[in-house]
Swiss-Prot record:
InterPro entries: Ribosomal_bL34 (IPR000271), Ribosomal_bL34_CS (IPR020939). Keywords: Ribonucleoprotein, Ribosomal protein. The keyword Ribonucleoprotein applies. It comes from Shewanella amazonensis (strain ATCC BAA-1098 / SB2B). GO terms for cellular component: ribonucleoprotein complex; ribosome. This is Large ribosomal subunit protein bL34. The keyword Heme does not apply. Residues 11-20, 31-45 have a biased composition (Basic residues). PANTHER family: LARGE RIBOSOMAL SUBUNIT PROTEIN BL34M, MITOCHONDRIAL RIBOSOMAL PROTEIN 34 FAMILY MEMBER. Belongs to the bacterial ribosomal protein bL34 family. Residues 1-45 are annotated as: Disordered. GO terms for biological process: translation.
Length: 45
């Protein structure tokens, strides 16, 4: 039997999907803009 592939880590989660990670790149800022336009309660992890 194979192991579960999702091994949660809040540090990795924030580093790859966090607000500051999104703000760091132009495309990340586009992601945030789209989510704001859609009216998301949470913009990032």
């Amino acid at each position: 039997m194979s192991k579960r592939t999702f091994q949660p880590s809040n540090l990795k989660r924030k580093r790859s999907h966090g607000f500051r990670a999104r703000m760091a790149t132009a495309n990340g800022r586009k992601v945030l803009a789209r989510r704001r336009a859609k009216g998301r309660a949470r913009l990032s992890a």
